[in-house]
């Protein structure tokens, strides 16, 4: 039984409140305590040795694990249907940890070309300095993913809902391609959260989240989470020496032999978090836990508000097109209805008539929407991707990702939808004055 295991409930809403935690046995505190401690006392020498030899559960140093973080990790793992998770300093740190655990110099990744700008930069510019190359492909083409695989490819990667074009990733089809080639499918599910989609149920093996967004929900912390589905058989694949060959850093331990379905997440913690140090602070974990407790209620309202706003923009004369997977005009509508039956999220983009100038005038006329580089806040947000979040991409890369000069991205919050629509209408009128 896990150290922090809560009641054996199965309902999603119940898990958001109880998974991974019981009342404190000493004080009776109902809320998860913040264990603001750098390190933890060993009761005796044998206990200490067991921790360092990975022979028992417990905490040594908060860079490796922390009791507050452990509750968050177990809670999100339960919500995603995984076998384990690691809380990281940011979503970028979670993505880097996944790649660094599986890849070495000379390895290769196949990724969707419709990605968050920071992830694109990591794959396109930073990782090649360490000998890891990435081929970017059309997220809607399963065959493009298949054709790009080489003998050195270690994983397929994509976002369930592409950023900012909202392309929907065909998880089941891509999982089949990945598994046929002997590699895992890694998915960023930040836009969806486990409330709207559980990627592991559709064949994904590893899930990455930016906890900064909808999981915490209020724009007050930076954090990430890496979830292991425990579904990939590392031992039968010949592509992963980091998991199937002796590791000198732990006396020739073979992670796949010793930990089975937990091999990936164990190495990620015992090596990646230990050596790269991108751990989450316990105060951050506490705030994310508070956000997750209301995740179902918030996501319902986010989706309801988004549908109202999308309907308004879709009929407005100043709008050329709206990119939201629930619209009949969206090419992935049918796939979205299967993968995301509760809704296609609260982030979407639209193209405004008049290009960059109109987009700038529109944004500067808004008073309720906040102009900033984030999503998933309780407050509604707006940004112009081509000049901000994706500005480091080349013109060709922007075009391939469908990011035009007039593209505006919205993250719809929890305000009254009528107020949001009024604010957007004012901005659209201002944008067309020339």
Regions found by a protein language model. Name each.
Residues 2-66, 74-75:
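N-terminal "arm"/small-domain region of PLP-dependent enzymes with the aminotransferase-like
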């Amino acid at each position: 039984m896990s150290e922090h295991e809560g009641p054996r409930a199965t309902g999603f809403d119940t898990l958001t409140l109880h998974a991974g935690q019981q009342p404190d046995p000493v004080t009776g505190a109902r809320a998860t305590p913040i264990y603001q401690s750098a390190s933890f006392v060993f009761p005796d020498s044998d206990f200490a040795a067991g921790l360092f030899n990975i022979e028992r559960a417990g905490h040594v140093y908060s860079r490796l694990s922390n009791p507050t973080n452990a509750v968050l990790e177990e809670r999100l793992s339960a919500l995603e249907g995984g076998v384990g998770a690691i809380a990281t300093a940011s979503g970028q740190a979670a993505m880097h940890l996944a790649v660094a655990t599986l890849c070495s110099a000379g390895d290769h990744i196949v990724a969707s070309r419709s990605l968050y700008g920071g992830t694109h930069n990591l794959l396109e510019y930073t990782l090649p300095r360490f000998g890891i190359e990435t081929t970017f492909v059309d997220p809607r083409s399963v065959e493009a993913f298949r054709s790009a695989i080489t003998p050195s490819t270690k994983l397929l990667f994509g976002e369930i809902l592409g950023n900012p074009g909202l392309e929907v990733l065909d998880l089941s089809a891509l999982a089949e391609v990945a598994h046929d080639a002997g590699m895992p499918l890694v998915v960023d599910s930040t836009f969806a959260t486990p409330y709207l989609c559980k990627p592991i149920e559709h064949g994904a093996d590893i899930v990455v989240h930016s906890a900064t967004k909808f999981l915490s929900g209020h724009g007050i912390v930076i954090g990430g989470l890496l979830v292991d589905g425990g579904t990939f058989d590392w031992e039968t694949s010949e592509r992963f020496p980091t998991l199937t060959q002796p590791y000198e850093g732990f006396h020739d331990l073979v992670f796949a032999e010793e930990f089975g379905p937990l091999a990936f997440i164990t190495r990620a913690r015992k090596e990646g978090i230990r050596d790269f140090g991108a751990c989450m602070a316990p105060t951050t974990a506490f705030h994310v836990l508070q956000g997750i407790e209301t995740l179902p209620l918030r996501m319902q309202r986010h989706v309801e508000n988004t549908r109202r706003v999308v309907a308004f923009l879709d009929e407005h004369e100043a709008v050329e097109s709206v990119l939201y997977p629930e619209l009949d005009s969206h090419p992935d509508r049918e796939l979205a209805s299967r993968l995301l039956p509760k809704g296609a999220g609260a982030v979407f983009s639209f193209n405004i008539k008049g290009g960059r100038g109109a987009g700038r005038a529109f944004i500067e006329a808004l008073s309720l929407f906040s102009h900033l580089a984030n999503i998933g806040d309780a407050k509604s947000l707006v940004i112009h991707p081509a000049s901000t979040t994706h500005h480091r991409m080349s013109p060709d890369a922007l075009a391939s990702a469908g990011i035009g000069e007039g593209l505006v991205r919205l993250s719809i919050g929890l305000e009254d939808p009528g107020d949001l629509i009024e604010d957007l209408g004012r901005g659209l009128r201002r944008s067309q004055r020339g």
